[in-house]
């Protein structure tokens, strides 16, 4: 017997005594617990693999299932997966993606693929910006407010996202926004530089472009500013071809920093490098963004500041006059306890990480699987 998806005729084949169903989605095999039933459809793919929508037969809600294939082939990818699972399980906020399940593998010894189940969203901000759907100033305010509201919670958990960009901001038809993809997140106290992954350059703060290792939560605020500008102009603010071009685009808009603004750079080489760059005056933001409301322009100027210590903080941004129609301090919760990355031991092997992800799946599914 097979379970069939009416929508596109994707059939589920029972495996492991009927405890699991296997779906073939455009050549990708998905083996999931039997409670995840048709209609099954592909809703996206990325470097990590493929995402499908399915229905949880127990709750009748549609969910997203992300398959991370061969998740333990290298330590960096495996660590990223574990980090995201642990972080999202720790978080509980309307504007942060939540994990509903880690599908427990049928056999621990054959555990190679990780399936993360989360709420299903309709689209992401990148898709909306690139579409021809009209966006008003109210849309812009609502998107940025929710982003800041979620970020306040994330930062209060002692976590930096480090990779905020439109495609990581998930939306549904009501314009509700959730921050996703925490695979690059770090604690605010860590000072390791991002050697593992190439974070999208266009949304990176100047201190990261200049290899500053002791960065702060201000890196995420810079990214919010880039996103705010992109919502209004529907073009990336700083689409740099490389780091040098990226820094030039930044200084062409916000002006070249003076010496006082370079205090955060500990490296004399970095300061010397910035000083020898072509000098640009700051542009008039109102002229540069004629379609942006004055309040949004003012907030943008406070986010796009070269010196991270002078950049507006997330709490201050929520209190900014532009956010006044939505801001309510009592509806902007913080995280009850800080998140700890203690599980990330430097000596961890792929097998150690596999064991920890296995334990996460057992936490969601305590019943032993059929072998």
Curated annotation (Swiss-Prot):
Keywords tagged on the record: ATP-binding, Kinase, Nucleotide-binding, Phosphoprotein, Serine/threonine-protein kinase, Transferase
SUPFAM superfamilies reported in the protein's UniProt record: Protein kinase-like (PK-like)
Short motif (TXY): ranges: 195-197
Domain Protein kinase: 37-323
Binding site for ATP: 43-51, 66
Active site per database record: 163
Name of the featured protein: Mitogen-activated protein kinase homolog MMK2
Organism, as annotated: Medicago sativa
Record gene name: MMK2
